[in-house]
Amino acid sequence: MARVTVQDAVEKIGNRFDLVLVAARRARQMQSGGKDALVPEENDKPTVIALREIEEGLITKDVLDARERQEQQEQEAAELAAVSSIMHNR
C-alpha cells in the first residue's frame, strides 16, 4: 500500500476542505461510475487512490468539471440522435 501524504495533496488543491470535496468526488466516480484509476491501484481503496491521483497532479477540480461536462455533452448528443432517429422512422 502506498503511503499518501495529505499535505502534498493539499498543496495541489489549495486547501484541505476543497481536497476533501475533490477526493470524495473522484472516489465516487471510481466506485460507482466505473471510472478507471489513473495510478496503479495496489489494493488501495478508492479514497486513497483519489488522493494519490491528486498528489500526482492527475486530478483537479477543473479536470473533474471538464470530464463531467464532456460526458454530459456526449449523453445529450446520444439522446438527440436517438430522438432524431425515432422521428425519421415515423
From Swiss-Prot:
InterPro entries: DNA-dir_RNA_pol_omega, Pol_omega/Rpo6/RPB6, RPB6/omega-like_sf. It comes from the Bacteria. GO terms for cellular component: cytosolic DNA-directed RNA polymerase complex. One of its GO terms (molecular function) is DNA binding. One of its GO terms (biological process) is DNA-templated transcription initiation. Residues 70-90 are annotated as: Disordered. Disulfide bonds: none annotated. It catalyses: RNA(n) + a ribonucleoside 5'-triphosphate = RNA(n+1) + diphosphate. Coiled coil: none annotated. Pfam families: RNA_pol_Rpb6. It is an enzyme of class 2 (transferase). Its EC number is 2.7.7.6. Keywords: DNA-directed RNA polymerase, Nucleotidyltransferase, Transcription, Transferase. Promotes RNA polymerase assembly. Latches the N- and C-terminal regions of the beta' subunit thereby facilitating its interaction with the beta and alpha subunits. The RNAP catalytic core consists of 2 alpha, 1 beta, 1 beta' and 1 omega subunit. When a sigma factor is associated with the core the holoenzyme is formed, which can initiate transcription. Belongs to the RNA polymerase subunit omega family. This is DNA-directed RNA polymerase subunit omega. It comes from Vibrio cholerae serotype O1 (strain ATCC 39315 / El Tor Inaba N16961). The lineage of its organism: Bacteria, Pseudomonadati, Pseudomonadota, Gammaproteobacteria, Vibrionales.
